[in-house]
Amino acid sequence: MTTPSFIPSVNFHLIKPCNMGCKYCFARFNDVASKSLTRGGLPKEDALAVVSALADFGFEKITFAGGEPTLYPWLTDVIELAKNKGMTTMLVTNGSRLNEAFYLRHAGLLDWITVSIDSLSVGTNLAIGRAKHGNQVFAREDYEVIAAMIHDYSYRLKINTVVSRYNHEEDMNDFIAHAKPERWKVFQALPIVGENDEYLEEFEITAEEFQQFLGRHGSQAKLVKENNDEMRGSYAMVDPKGCFFTNVNGQLEASSPILTVGCDAALREMNYDLTKFHDRGGRYDW
């Protein structure tokens, strides 16, 4: 198999809305006018066409994100199409809408479920804004149940943790050891102009503080870290309007719509960094 000359995995942020309000979220898409979208995302046929274009171009893995992607009414349809076109399929979710019906419905279609878990403390999650409708907060026990069910239904589990001023002193070793994710991505909270900079003083941490969190969890073999520099420009991402976008300059900048100019032309408008993608461990056994 030839090695692609472009980043071979893509994140499709299907939908703008979310049922939580994490202060350091970089994907609020404040420039996306909801009135131009159906329920905050592309209409079904357009979303399917974007997925088809991405698959036909040669992307090998697609991660459906948001907002909160489980709010997207045609989530199953886009996952099924991606799977049928031979892509590895992944979902990034806050876990609030995962249940037995979801696991059964997506069996054989969805390969990975990534759960965003920043803290095991109710108080910390509330401070972060990781609370459903602002007040329904997950505790450690809730996350343990989610992880167990993902394993029980034979999905591959990944956990994403954003390290910020709120949680940088936390110890998650025992939880991670019990949750047994195949991959634990640990991100330094990333400031993005126009998305989360209003809360910058609340969540921003230094490189040293991030390193201290990593050092505390150095025994976790599945940990993959990403600091601010490693994150910028190393992801191929599609926004809820069906445009590629990048964060390389510290703000979100979008391409022309994929369905208007085609995947190749839209991708050429971006300055994604394939070397950075590989350096951060972006290619793995997916």
From Swiss-Prot:
It catalyses: GTP + AH2 + S-adenosyl-L-methionine = 3'-deoxy-3',4'-didehydro-GTP + 5'-deoxyadenosine + L-methionine + A + H2O + H(+). It is an enzyme of class 4 (lyase). Its EC number is 4.2.-.-. GO terms for molecular function: 4 iron, 4 sulfur cluster binding; lyase activity; metal ion binding. [4Fe-4S] cluster binds at C18, C22, C25. Keywords: 4Fe-4S, Antiviral defense, Iron, Iron-sulfur, Lyase, Metal-binding, S-adenosyl-L-methionine. Its cofactor is [4Fe-4S] cluster. GO terms for biological process: defense response to virus. Residues 2-223 form the Radical SAM core domain. It holds the Pfam family Radical_SAM. It comes from the Bacteria. The keyword Iron applies. Expression of pVip21 in E.coli (strain MG1655) confers resistance to phage T7; prevents culture collapse upon infection. Catalyzes the conversion of guanosine triphosphate (GTP) to 3'-deoxy-3',4'-didehydro-GTP (ddhGTP), probably via a SAM-dependent radical mechanism. Overexpression of this protein is not toxic in E.coli, thus modified nucleotides do not affect bacterial transcription machinery. NCBIfam families: viperin_w_prok. This is S-adenosylmethionine-dependent nucleotide dehydratase. It comes from Lewinella persica (strain ATCC 23167 / DSM 23188 / NBRC 102663 / NCIMB 1396 / T-3). The lineage of its organism: Bacteria, Pseudomonadati, Bacteroidota, Saprospiria, Saprospirales. The gene is vip21.
